[in-house]
Amino acid sequence: QHREGYDFARLVAQSPELEAFTVSNPVGQTTIDFQDVGAVRMLNQALLKDYYNINFWDIPTNCLCPPIPGRVDYIHYLADLLACSNDQKIPRGRNIKALDIGTGASVVYPLVGQSEYGWHFTGVDIDPAALKSAQQICQFNKLKINLRRQNIRENIFRGVIEPHDTFHITLCNPPFHASME
């Protein structure tokens, strides 16, 4: 959806607060300063609101602010992968169960996957503050996303997957660290 850039007029119409972060690039096109974390957050909020019907998305300032288009692409790749074993038809609906390891405060994969395809998500994280933020986003938007805490960092699946659980897909980002060390 965003390969040709962003429709800032449309996004500002939906989220007027984004306008304060818009600038003109050297060729006169409207954009934002992608080095400005506040601008990226506001763009993410506008994209989620306009394209995915997520009316509240606010994460703590010390948390990763994921670029929405890349996360959307990942969900579409997974949909294409699921279609390979479903007569080339992308499966939709809550009968498709997805497990997001490291869902984070932004809970972005479950938000987009549920909005685009109606899939049922379970998000897992080790950080209680991230899960609290994710829970607030889910509650405010009236979304049924199951959130679970992984208490032992070394265990990725053990302790969060219950004996009755079945998942069609598991997704994650690489681990994020506070520094390069």
Predicted segment positions?
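Gly/Ser/Thr-rich loops at beta-strand to alpha-helix junctions
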Residues: L64, P69-G70, T103-V107
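Short, well-ordered alpha-helices that flank and scaffold nucleotide-derived cofactor binding pockets
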Residues: D80, L111, S115, Q136-F140
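Conserved class I S-adenosyl-L-methionine
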Residues: P91-G104, T122
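Conserved SAM-binding loop of SAM-dependent methyltransferases across substrates and taxa
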Residues: A105-W119
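Conserved SAM-binding motif I beta-strand of class I
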Residues: H120-I126
